[in-house]
């Protein structure tokens, strides 16, 4: 699966541009946020924009004006064909890199060195390229499609000064900025032999070997390790630019010993003479805030020329027991966004060369906003160098193209995390090492820079995520809330046990025996009038779905009306109550025992006093003396405005108002007394209405014919009667004559 993904990514731009453009230099060196934070860097990136595909329309005005540069603006495909046909060692001055020149470039580059240093640099370059091309074996005559990210070439070994061109486009017309002709000619001459040597190396299918200052072959973090992981097997040479580039990068280990002897030629007298000037130029770069590599594009080969001090290993990979230079991607949202988009950070870190005398300190990573690190990090003396292991095809499972999520495996000392880029143009998975939890001096020498992702573990983890919403364990349906006011609360035992189907798996046999049976109906008993406490009748009234009988309806006013809210009764109320009680008792004993609401007693002509009820509302006669006394009592009144505006003292006004409040509280309008007398009356309210109702003749006839009136003459009753009659006729006929006679009789009938 990783092989297919790599092939598809390597052929992206070829399919889009039909082979005329391989997608090199599509990613710019800096992101938008870094350019906004640094105006100097924003000015530099104007000339560093990626080279776009061009039609084969010939050279520009600038190239036609220059002699010997007519072939410089040929399309990329034509340049690759010429490089393939020229073979190794074929280098002509016509194919030189036209570097744009500007006033800012003249200030930044200290190219005032003598022609002696430039010529010595060219001689050393020619010698190095010839020896490398002779030692390399031909990998194929077919020009490969160069991948977007190339490994930086360390020119410290051959004494190359840190030249940083300002752009990639060969046809950039920036000659009018005011640079002197001597600086421009020396700059173009310095890249002449380098361009053709790289073109010859690319045409023969070889790659520039990388070597560390201390003799160990190490690759820059991120980009080269990813390229080695993508294609380390020689049998994929025909699958595109990825495999061919991987074979070139694997030649580093084979030629490490051969390149070691070239180190003696790099420290010549000519190179050491020009070293202080180059160091001064590098210091000027740091003062201007210009950090990062410059790329020279020549015939599809992307060469990264660093400063005078070119890095072999990024400082963030030099994780020791005392220093930790790895980025933490959980600091802020801005760091996360730049961690996904700015892949160029691996090349933007640098360390001092062994040629520099002051090797005790080095500049660490530049900050995410484009400013250098706050303080230099000291080097550890006992740990000279950390060699990064070359990852082979066995670790190809670490390249996961997961876009939505990523998985992390934690060890005792190292935690690795895979960050997936959000940029649609790169689609590459970058791996970074997060800060170690506990550093061990014995094991801090090796740093794991990739994540082995196992497919089975990922599937198990995804299955667990899918089942979390189903098997939560603690969730149970809310059955108690649906019962409402009709059901009682569940017993404590059943509540603790929960649902029968969701019991704990760790329950022992004894607990299962003590568990309450699941089919018990004790919790599902329907109660029409639940007993819930002190105000049980009020709770039953609030439940509108309960069917009440007459006694419950009659008891409701008695509960609502409290005796404490009733005003004090008149003094003669006790005598009236005793007289009424005696009359009620005599009438109830002489009655027939039937209620006044019974229709049968009314029809029979029996009229008796009803049974005594304390809460029936009766409108009988009341004692006129007491009522007249209550009604005739004057309502206390006081002119409050005149009292307040009067000349009396404040204390007198306050006493007058307090006495008025007491009079109002003591006054009674008699309404409560009327209600109390009506409830205590001995006469039934039904007798008052029945005296004029039952004398009508049609009412008596209706009660006499109650049975006939009770029958319902509806469609349902009519249908049922007809069906019953038909059933009697049909089945009686079939039982007498048999089935044959029934059918024959039906056929003879006429409609």
From Swiss-Prot:
UniProt source species: Eremothecium gossypii (strain ATCC 10895 / CBS 109.51 / FGSC 9923 / NRRL Y-1056) (Yeast)
Biased composition, class Low complexity, residue ranges: 110-120, 564-574, 585-596
Bias (Acidic residues) ranges: 24-36, 332-347
Biased composition (Polar residues): 187-205, 413-424, 575-584
Free-text function comment from the UniProt entry: Involved in the resistance to unfolded protein response (UPR)-inducing agents.
Name of the gene encoding the protein in the UniProt record: FYV8
Positions of region (Disordered): 1-278, 320-428, 489-523, 564-596
Name of this chain's protein: Protein FYV8
Disulphide bridges, residue numbers: none
Alphabetical list of InterPro entries matching this protein: Fyv8
Family: Belongs to the FYV8 family.
Ranges of biased composition (kind: Basic and acidic residues): 123-134
Bias-annotated ranges (Basic residues): 1-11
């Amino acid at each position: 699966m990783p092989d297919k993904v790599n092939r598809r990514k390597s052929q992206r731009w070829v399919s889009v541009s039909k082979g005329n453009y391989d997608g090199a230099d599509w990613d710019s060196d800096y992101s938008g946020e870094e350019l906004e934070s640094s105006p100097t860097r924003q000015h530099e990136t104007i000339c560093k924009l990626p080279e776009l595909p061009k039609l084969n329309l010939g050279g520009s005005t600038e190239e036609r004006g220059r002699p010997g540069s007519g072939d410089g603006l040929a399309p990329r495909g034509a340049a690759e064909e010429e490089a393939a046909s020229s073979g190794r060692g074929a280098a002509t001055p016509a194919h030189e890199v036209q570097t744009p020149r500007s006033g800012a470039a003249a200030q930044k580059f200290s190219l005032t060195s003598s022609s002696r240093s430039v010529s010595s640099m060219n001689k050393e370059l020619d010698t190095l390229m010839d020896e490398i091309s002779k030692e390399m074996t031909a990998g194929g005559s077919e020009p490969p499609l160069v991948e977007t990210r190339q490994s930086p070439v360390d020119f410290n070994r051959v004494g190359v000064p840190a030249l940083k061109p300002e752009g990639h486009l060969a046809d950039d017309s920036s000659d009018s900025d005011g640079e002197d002709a001597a600086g421009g000619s020396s700059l173009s001459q310095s890249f002449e032999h380098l361009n053709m040597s790289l073109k010859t190396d690319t045409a023969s299918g070889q790659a520039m070997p990388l070597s560390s200052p201390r003799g160990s072959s190490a690759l820059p973090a991120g980009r080269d390790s990813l390229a080695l992981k993508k294609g380390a097997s020689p049998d994929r040479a025909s699958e595109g630019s990825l495999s061919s580039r991987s074979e070139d990068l694997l030649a580093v280990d084979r030629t490490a010993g051969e390149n070691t002897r070239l180190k003696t030629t790099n420290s010549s007298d000519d190179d050491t003479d020009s070293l202080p000037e180059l160091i001064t130029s590098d210091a000027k770069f740091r003062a201007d805030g210009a950090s990062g590599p410059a790329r020279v594009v020549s015939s599809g080969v992307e060469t990264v020329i660093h400063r005078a001090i070119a890095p072999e290993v990024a400082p963030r990979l030099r994780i020791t027991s005392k220093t930790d230079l790895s980025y933490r991607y959980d600091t802020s949202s801005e760091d996360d966004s730049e961690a996904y988009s700015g892949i160029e950070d691996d090349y933007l870190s640098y360390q001092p060369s062994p040629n520099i005398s002051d090797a005790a300190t080095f500049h660490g990573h530049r900050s995410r906003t484009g400013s250098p690190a706050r303080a230099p990090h000291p080097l550890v003396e006992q740990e000279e160098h950390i060699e990064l292991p070359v990852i082979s095809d066995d670790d190809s499972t670490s390249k996961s193209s997961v876009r939505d999520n990523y998985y992390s495996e934690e060890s005792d000392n190292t935690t690795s995390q895979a960050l997936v880029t959000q940029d649609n143009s790169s689609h590459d998975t970058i791996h970074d090492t997060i800060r170690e939890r506990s550093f061990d001096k014995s094991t801090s020498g090796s740093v794991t820079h990739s994540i082995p992702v196992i497919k089975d573990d990922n599937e198990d983890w995804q299955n667990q995520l899918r089942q979390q919403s189903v098997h939560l364990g603690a969730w149970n349906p809310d059955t108690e809330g649906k019962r409402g006011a009709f059901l009682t609360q569940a017993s404590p035992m059943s509540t603790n046990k929960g649902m029968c189907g969701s019991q704990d798996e760790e329950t022992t046999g004894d607990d299962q025996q003590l568990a309450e049976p699941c089919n018990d109906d004790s919790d599902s008993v329907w109660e029409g009038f639940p007993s819930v406490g002190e105000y049980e009748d009020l709770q039953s009234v609030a439940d509108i779905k309960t069917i009440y009988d007459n006694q419950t309806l009659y008891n409701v006013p008695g509960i609502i009306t409290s005796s404490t809210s009733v005003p004090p009764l008149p003094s003669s109320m006790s005598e009236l109550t005793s007289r009424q009680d005696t009359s009620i008792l005599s009438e109830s004993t002489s009655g027939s025992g039937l209620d006044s609401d019974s229709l049968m007693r009314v029809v029979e002509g029996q009229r008796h006093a009803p049974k005594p009820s304390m809460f029936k509302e009766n409108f009988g006669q009341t004692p006129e003396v007491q009522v007249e006394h209550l009604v005739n009592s004057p309502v206390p009144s006081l002119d409050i405005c005149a009292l307040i505006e009067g000349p009396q003292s404040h204390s007198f006004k306050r006493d007058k108002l307090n006495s008025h409040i007491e009079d109002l509280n003591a006054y009674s309008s008699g309404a409560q007394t009327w209600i109390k007398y009506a409830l205590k009356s001995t006469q039934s309210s039904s007798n008052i209405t029945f005296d004029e109702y039952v004398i009508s003749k049609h009412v008596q006839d209706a009660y006499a014919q109650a049975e006939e009136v009770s029958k319902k003459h509806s469609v349902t009753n009519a249908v049922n009667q007809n069906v019953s009659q038909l059933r009697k006729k049909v089945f009686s006929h079939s039982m007498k004559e048999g089935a044959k006679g029934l059918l024959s009789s039906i056929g003879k009938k006429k409609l």
